[in-house]
């Protein structure tokens, strides 16, 4: 009944992944991001992650697998997803939604920490404001974006960009894979002397 649609969706996902894999810049960006994060952890820093909608879920998933576990048991790593509902609703109400992440970064971000901002379009105003707040704190910035990087293009120390111009779900599929690889590489870096 839906076999053709299912195959079409899976083929499009596979094609998007293949294009991402075949661009060496993407592989290099993931490696640089993992080393940047591990270096921050080794120096006593933390990562603060944020996103909207599905990207918000990815930011939470990233933090959870760093503080909890990925595949193997190991010490937890310092990671916070900006997801506290009371903070989000307070700042949205009192300042506006575009400040929900930047206010948090202003409050808890420190020099040596890393901000991970996730936006499939690269145009999320509240992520852009969080990047500005992170820069003001002396933090490093990693972004996961899509399409042409949007307004966030060029704003990060490391940008992992999925150059897909269709629906956001294809970009999110690559983002979650990149997140899992980041965690795997961070774990390898953390056991180095």
UniProtKB/Swiss-Prot annotation:
It catalyses: 2 D-sedoheptulose 7-phosphate = D-glycero-alpha-D-manno-heptose 7-phosphate + D-glycero-beta-D-manno-heptose 7-phosphate. Signal peptide: none annotated. InterPro entries: GmhA/DiaA (IPR035461), Phosphoheptose_Isoase (IPR004515), SIS_dom (IPR001347), SIS_dom_sf (IPR046348), SIS_GmhA/DiaA_subfam (IPR050099). It is an enzyme of class 5 (isomerase). Pfam families: SIS_2 (PF13580). Keywords: Carbohydrate metabolism, Cytoplasm, Isomerase, Metal-binding, Zinc. Binds 1 zinc ion per subunit. Its cofactor is Zn(2+). Its main location: cytoplasm. GO terms for cellular component: cytoplasm. It is found in: Cytoplasm. CDD domains: SIS_GmhA (cd05006). Substrate binds at residues 52-54, 65, 93-94, 119-121, 124, 172. One of its GO terms (molecular function) is D-sedoheptulose 7-phosphate isomerase activity. Its EC number is 5.3.1.28. SUPFAM superfamilies: SIS domain. Pathway: Carbohydrate biosynthesis; D-glycero-D-manno-heptose 7-phosphate biosynthesis; D-glycero-alpha-D-manno-heptose 7-phosphate and D-glycero-beta-D-manno-heptose 7-phosphate from sedoheptulose 7-phosphate: step 1/1. Catalyzes the isomerization of sedoheptulose 7-phosphate in D-glycero-D-manno-heptose 7-phosphate. Homotetramer. PANTHER family: PHOSPHOHEPTOSE ISOMERASE, SEDOHEPTULOSE 7-PHOSPHATE ISOMERASE / DNAA INITIATOR-ASSOCIATING FACTOR FOR REPLICATION INITIATION. The reaction produces a racemic mixture of D-glycero-alpha-D-manno-heptose 7-phosphate and D-glycero-beta-D-manno-heptose 7-phosphate. Belongs to the SIS family. GmhA subfamily. This is Phosphoheptose isomerase. It comes from Serratia proteamaculans (strain 568).
């Amino acid at each position: 009944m839906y076999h053709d649609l299912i195959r079409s969706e899976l083929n499009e996902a596979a094609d998007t992944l293949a294009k991402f894999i075949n661009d060496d810049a993407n592989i290099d960006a993931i490696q640089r991001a993992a080393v940047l994060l591990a270096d921050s952890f080794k120096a006593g820093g933390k990562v603060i992650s944020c996103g909207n909608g599905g990207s918000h879920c990815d930011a939470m998933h990233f933090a959870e697998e760093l503080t909890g576990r990925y595949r193997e048991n190991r010490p937890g790593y310092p990671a916070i997803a900006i997801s506290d509902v009371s903070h989000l609703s307070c700042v949205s109400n009192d300042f506006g939604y575009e400040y929900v992440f930047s206010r948090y970064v202003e409050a808890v971000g420190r020099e040596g920490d890393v901000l991970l901002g996730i936006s499939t379009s690269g145009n999320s105003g509240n992520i852009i404001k969080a990047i500005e707040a992170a820069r003001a704190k002396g933090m490093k910035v990693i972004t996961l974006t899509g399409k042409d990087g949007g307004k966030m293009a060029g704003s990060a120390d490391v940008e992992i960009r999925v150059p897909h111009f269709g629906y956001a779900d294809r970009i999110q599929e690559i983002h979650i894979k990149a997140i899992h690889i980041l965690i795997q590489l961070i774990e390898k870096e953390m056991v180095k002397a």
